[in-house]
């Protein structure tokens, strides 16, 4: 009795489509998660008290973090369509973006903790509030840094990038 083996290109294609689907899911989650408080804030009356100007810092922070999400989706798309050379060139932008995100994420968390209403009306005490974003920055640094360190090992690299 002979076993029928699945051809490798098919398995590889399925894996690439899995990561593309995950990247799309991340984009959708970010858009839905921030729709009421950021992207569509003027249309949600329960957030009317948040229509006051938000510190520029948070817009800059959000821009860099959205850039990371867009870059992640682009990078995944490039590998799905078989463009690894462009993926590697854009990877340098991602590597440069990591310390910028760590800086803006950490300082943004510290600024939000000082606000009387917290960050978008999450009025937790400052130390309690910081228990979420500061460890998030450490985990992101470890995962993204690990992904860069293991970029020569595609299976490890792609998993770390997805988790970052």
Ranges and model annotations:
Residues 74-82, 144-152:
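Structural signal for the C-terminal ends of transmembrane alpha-helices
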Residues 10-23:
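N-terminal membrane topogenic signal
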Residues 77-111:
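Hydrophobic/aromatic-rich structural module bridging two neighboring secondary-structure elements via a short loop
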Residues 49-63, 122-134:
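Short aromatic-rich membrane-water interface segments that cap or initiate transmembrane helices
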Residues 64-76:
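Central hydrophobic cores of alpha-helical transmembrane segments in multi-pass inner-membrane proteins
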Residues 39-49, 114-124:
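Membrane-interface helix termini and inter-helical loops of multi-pass transporters
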Residues 26-43:
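Alpha-helical transmembrane segments of multi-pass membrane proteins
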């Amino acid at each position: 009795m002979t076993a029928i083996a699945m051809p490798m290109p098919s398995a590889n294609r399925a894996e690439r489509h899995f990561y593309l689907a995950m990247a799309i899911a991340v984009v959708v989650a970010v858009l839905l998660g921030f729709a009421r408080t950021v992207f569509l804030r003027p249309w949600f009356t329960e957030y009317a008290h948040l229509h006051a100007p938000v510190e520029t810092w948070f817009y800059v922070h959000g821009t860099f973090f959205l850039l990371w999400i867009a870059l992640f989706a682009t990078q995944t798309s490039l590998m799905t369509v078989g463009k690894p050379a462009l993926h590697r060139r854009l990877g340098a932008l991602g590597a440069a973006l990591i310390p910028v995100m760590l800086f803006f994420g950490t300082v943004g968390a510290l600024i939000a903790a000082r606000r009387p209403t917290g960050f978008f009306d999450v009025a937790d005490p400052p130390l309690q509030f910081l228990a979420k974003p500061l460890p998030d920055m450490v985990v992101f640094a470890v995962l993204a840094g690990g992904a860069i360190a293991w970029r020569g090992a595609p299976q490890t690299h792609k998993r770390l990038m997805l988790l970052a």
